Each structure stands twice: as C-alpha cells, then as structure tokens.
Design a protein with these regions (language model features):
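Membrane-interface helix-loop junction between the first two transmembrane segments
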Residues: 26-45
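Loop-to-helix transition at the N-terminal end of transmembrane alpha-helices
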Residues: 43-55
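Cytoplasmic membrane-interface regions of multi-pass membrane proteins
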Residues: 36-42, 102-109
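Alpha-helical transmembrane segments of multipass membrane proteins
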Residues: 21-29, 90-95, 125-129
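Transmembrane alpha-helical segments of integral membrane proteins
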Residues: 91-107
C-alpha cells in the first residue's frame, strides 16, 4: 500500500505540468499558424499539402521537445511557464531565420507543396527544440 501511495504522490504535479503543457501546445499552434503567411491547416486539409504537413509537424515536435526539457529542469510551475514562453519565442525566431535568411522563398515553396522546403523548415524547428531543451539547465 505504501508503494502505491508513493507512486501516486507525484500525480498532482504530473497533472499540473501535463495540463500546462497541453495549453502551451495549443497556444503555440494558434500563435505559430497566425504568424506564418500561409494557412497550414487549409493547405493540409483541403490540398493535402505534404510540405505544409511536414513543416508544421516539425514545428510541433521542436516545441514539444523544448517544453519537455523545461518540464524536466524547472524548479516550479512558474519557472516551467517562463521557459515555455522562451521555447515558443525560439521556435518563432527559427521560422523567421529560415524564412528571411536561410531559405527566403520557403513560404512560397511550401504553398507549392515543395517537400524539400518543408523538410528544411521541420529540421530547423526540431534542431532548435533540441538545442533549446539542452540549454534549459541550472
């Protein structure tokens, strides 16, 4: 019985961090798709645009990797929330770097369903998420 009680002792914190994580992912989805010049959901749903699906999936994965690092290394929920916002900003900056520096026509290429552009954007997003998660230490 003590073992079960010990296992359940961390459950409230799990629920708190997991709930905040889901809220952050939903907020990220809302903000990220508003900042991109194309409508990912329309491209994916109506046009079966693979490049848009890959790019958006990479952005989600990169953000989730980063907030998982924040959850692991945060000292409390407020700390986690601050790092969640930092991770979101890092993903938005990563998109801007790809769009304006690395691959200036990336948005047009994704709209045309050019898969290599979606892969590059996804790879940068995931890479930034991994770096972000690794740097969130004390």
């Amino acid at each position: 019985m003590h073992m079960i009680a010990g296992l359940l002792a961390g459950f409230p914190n799990f629920l708190l961090y997991f709930s905040v994580s889901i809220i952050f992912v939903l907020a990220f989805k809302f903000i990220y798709v508003k900042l991109t010049p194309y409508d990912e959901w329309r491209l994916i749903k109506e046009k079966q645009n693979t490049a848009a699906a890959v790019a958006l999936s990479g952005a989600f994965l990169g953000y989730c990797i980063a907030i998982s690092g924040a959850a692991k290394n945060s000292v409390n929920i407020v700390d986690f929330m601050v790092w969640g916002v930092v991770a979101m900003l890092a993903q938005i900056i990563a998109f801007a770097i790809v769009r304006f520096i690395l691959l200036p026509r990336v948005t047009e290429r994704i709209e045309k369903d050019e898969l290599p552009a979606g892969i590059v954007l996804a790879a940068v997003s995931i890479s930034v998420g991994i770096l972000n998660a690794a740097c969130m230490t004390y």
